[in-house]
């Protein structure tokens, strides 16, 4: 038995965002947002459609959206690549979801809270040890919570999860282990099989139940991710080398700053054959015009 990689956009959406995934998503959100407590009892998946088949692999991310029984909107995103301005994009998507709720003539009292749950396959907060981080509005000096604290950002940094299979204790542990390691498993672990929603998630992720076309599509998506990771790593290395060389001539600080710019442009150049201009701009933080100048 082999399982598809939940960290790819198609697999993540298939497992958590399809029309038959409600119970799975409820268990998953309770585990990651509410520390395993059964806070969520019901939800509606807002966009229960799978992403289109790969056409040039231009999509850089995909999210799942749901509305809880109390009206709260939840945006769930799996992010594999540490692209420039990613943190700003998370804030933008949460704010946009909050602001775009109102129709013409509706008052602010109609607004519902928004939770943005983001899983990253990289360390987003390098100097922070916590695996799961919750960010909300609070007073700067004494931490007093803002009364209408209706936007919450929740991050799960997968590299910080280091538990082995035999060390899994909580529902949170087991769901994170599933996301991080399902691709390398050959059977459903005994200590995870007793949770019905996890068992169903493994069933959806079973490669044997996919068509050859779906498997080919998933393989291309995984290769695309690996190519992007390689291109970004190479661009960073090339930019640093160029920056250090210039640092010896111009002064270290100025050279390193120039190196960062060179790294960004090197990353963009390495992506020219793989992505369109808009996707490269979203990945690197360059403007579309700057990307076009590199072609």
PLM regions: where:
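Elongated, amphipathic alpha-helical interaction scaffolds
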Residues: 1-295
């Amino acid at each position: 038995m082999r399982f598809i990689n939940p960290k790819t956009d198609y697999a993540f959406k298939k497992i958590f965002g399809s029309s038959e995934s409600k119970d799975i998503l409820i268990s998953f959100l309770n585990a990651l947002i509410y520390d395993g407590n059964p806070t969520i009892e019901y939800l509606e998946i807002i966009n229960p459609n799978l992403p289109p088949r790969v056409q040039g692999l231009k999509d850089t991310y995909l999210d799942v959206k749901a509305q809880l029984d109390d009206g709260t909107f939840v945006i769930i995103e799996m992010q594999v690549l540490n692209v420039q301005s990613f943190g700003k994009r998370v804030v933008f998507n949460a704010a946009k979801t909050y602001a775009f709720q109102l129709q013409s003539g509706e008052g602010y009292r109609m607004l519902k809270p928004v939770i943005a749950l983001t899983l990253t396959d990289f360390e987003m907060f390098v100097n922070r040890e916590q695996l799961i981080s919750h960010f909300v509005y609070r007073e700067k000096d004494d931490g007093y919570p803002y009364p209408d604290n209706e936007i919450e950002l929740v991050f799960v940094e997968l590299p910080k999860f280091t538990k082995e299979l035999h060390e899994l204790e909580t529902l949170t542990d087991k769901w994170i282990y599933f996301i991080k390691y399902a691709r390398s498993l050959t059977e459903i672990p005994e200590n995870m099989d007793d949770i019905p929603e996890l068992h169903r998630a493994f069933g959806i992720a079973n490669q044997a139940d996919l068509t050859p076309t779906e498997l080919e599509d998933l393989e291309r998506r995984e290769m695309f991710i690996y190519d992007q990771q390689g291109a970004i790593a190479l661009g960073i290395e090339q930019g640093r080398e160029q920056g250090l060389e210039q640092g010896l001539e111009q002064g270290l600080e100025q050279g390193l700053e120039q190196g960062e710019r060179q790294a960004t442009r090197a990353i963009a150049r390495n992506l020219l054959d793989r992505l369109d201009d808009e996707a490269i701009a979203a990945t690197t933080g360059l403007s579309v015009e700057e990307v076009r100048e590199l072609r």
